[in-house]
C-alpha cells in the first residue's frame, strides 16, 4: 500500500470556495480511481492549504489509475475549473512503517 499526500495551496480567501467546489465536482470523479483516506485544512505553516491523502495498492496501481483518470472526460472538464484556485500543488508518496495501523 502507498499513500499520496497531495497538498493544494489556494488563493487567499478562496479555501472554503475551493473545498465546496472540489467536494461537489472533483471528489465524485477522482473517487472512482483512488481511495480517500482523509482531507485536512492547514491551520499552521503554509496557510490556505488543503491536504488530501489518497491510498493505492502500489506505485503501479497509482500510475494506472492516474492514467485512466487523465482520460476521463468529466475530469478533463473539471481541471479548468480547479486551476484558477491554485497557487501551488505538491505530491508526496509515503509507505507505512511496519507498525503503522494503515498498511
Regions from the language model: what does each represent?
Residues 14-38:
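Short amphipathic alpha-helical segments
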Residues 11, 32-51, 57, 74-103:
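Glycine-rich beta-strand-turn "strand-cap" elements at beta-sheet edges
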Residues 16-20, 58-71:
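Short amphipathic alpha-helices within nucleic acid-binding modules
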Residues 21-24, 68, 81-84:
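Residues within well-ordered alpha-helical secondary structure of globular protein domains
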Residues 2-6, 18, 30, 49-54:
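Short, structured motif recognition centered on aromatic/hydrophobic residues
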Residues 1-17, 98-103:
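Surface-exposed interaction/gating patches
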Amino acid at each position: 500500500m502507498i499513500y499520496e499526500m497531495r497538498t493544494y495551496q489556494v488563493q487567499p480567501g478562496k479555501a472554503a470556495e475551493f473545498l465546496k467546489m472540489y467536494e461537489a465536482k472533483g471528489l465524485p470523479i477522482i473517487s472512482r480511481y483512488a481511495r480517500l483516506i482523509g482531507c485536512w485544512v492547514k491551520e499552521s505553516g503554509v496557510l490556505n492549504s488543503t491536504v488530501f491523502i489518497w491510498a493505492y495498492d502500489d506505485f503501479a496501481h497509482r500510475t494506472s489509475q492516474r492514467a485512466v483518470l487523465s482520460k476521463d472526460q468529466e475530469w478533463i472538464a473539471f481541471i479548468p475549473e480547479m486551476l484558477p484556485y491554485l497557487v501551488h500543488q505538491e505530491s508526496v508518496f509515503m509507505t507505512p512503517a511496519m507498525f503503522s495501523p494503515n498498511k
